Amino acid sequence: MAELMTWTNEPIERLPQFSPYLTNFNGLVKREGGPANAFPDAMRCIDLDAYEKGLKKGIHNPTVDAVIGVSSGKSAELALIELRLNYKNADNLSPTKLEEKVSCSKDILSGCGKLHLIVYFVFNKQV
């Protein structure tokens, strides 16, 4: 039987290099075209796109939208989340570009803690 996982802010709040980029997860979901208040108000995330843009001017490496903390009770991990809520057609999705986002995000998070094995891609119902 699979272990029940839940969100936790602990693993993202202990990373000082990302503290300027911590944001409310509901706010990020809404900015990406999702519903308001779908998650608990206390749930925070690292806005990895904002982090990458704040790091350097000009060309930015592609990253997933958010990093959240998850826990099964034993240990906390960092989970990568890509929100594709504005997409209307699956043909507009590029597996290569999505893989690049994951790869660049993992590079940024290298040494920051254990990464959850599953990367979550969230789409709207039409895709």
Where are these regions (language model features)?
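Acidic-basic catalytic patches of nuclease active cores, encompassing PD-(D/E)XK
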Residues: 1-59, 70
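Short, flexible beta-strand-to-coil junctions
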Residues: 69-74, 125-126
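Short, solvent-exposed secondary-structure capping/transition elements
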Residues: 75-78, 114-115
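Catalytic cores of nucleic-acid endonucleases
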Residues: 86-127
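Beta-rich catalytic cores
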Residues: 62
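Conserved catalytic cores of phosphodiester-cleaving nucleases, focusing on short active-site segments
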Residues: 66-68, 77-86, 105
